[in-house]
Amino acid sequence: MTLRDNPVKATLAGGGRAFGAMVFEFFTPGLPQLCVNAGAEFALFDMEHTGLGFETLKTQCALCRGLGIVPMARVPRSEYHFIARALDVGALGVMVPMVGTADEAAHIVSCARYPPQGRRGAAFGFAHDDYQGGNVPEKIAALHARTLLIAQIETVEGLRNVEAIAAVPGIDVLWLGHFDLTNSMGIPGAFDHPDYVAAVARIVAACEQAGKVAAFLATDERSARDAVARGFRMFAYGIDQLMLQEALRAGLSMLREIRR
């Protein structure tokens, strides 16, 4: 029995950077292959702000199998059934939004790990272990080792407790939720505001102090360059429906400008 590994987690653990796509709209059969063709190392499927359900997530994770791309899911919240089910259907990583305390972060880790380290219910020979048998203790160790756990810092409460959250064993990545954080701070969309700039610096410093990774969704070159300069190491690029819309708008504009 050999389980799939998680090269994104390995890259980050080795001090490298990881680049991928965050998918909000187009959960189509060809999407994972398109991401691979574009050079994405992971596909992060959003369940927080979309209608994505577990059956479709399971299909997307299956489509990623064998393509060399790591499937992950952002679940709606930190409840056990969201985290455990996302992993059971084949996600190799889970992002949890609006993590506010170290206790919540520890709860997330517990939901993702089997006893005695956690509380995840056991079901083997399913999607998450590629429908294989094998030595159960070895399988559990492999599943724990490959699972990437991401806590989003996007509230004043999360920012206030960011050092404690970063220090929780088993949390691998802190992902900056930039829009929600500015909303929570009372400065919606003010990404140049001194308080927001200081908040970002605090999140990155907490990651560096705890040996964790800071992550970010970049939508333009300016924000990407700024994040790289600050020390972020995990990136998703773009919002799929907006990228299609912008490309289509540009193409239609080009066509309308052509005259015989």
Each model region followed by its residue ranges:
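Expand to "…catalyze enediolate/carbanion chemistry for C-C bond making/breaking, isomerization
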Residues: M1-R260
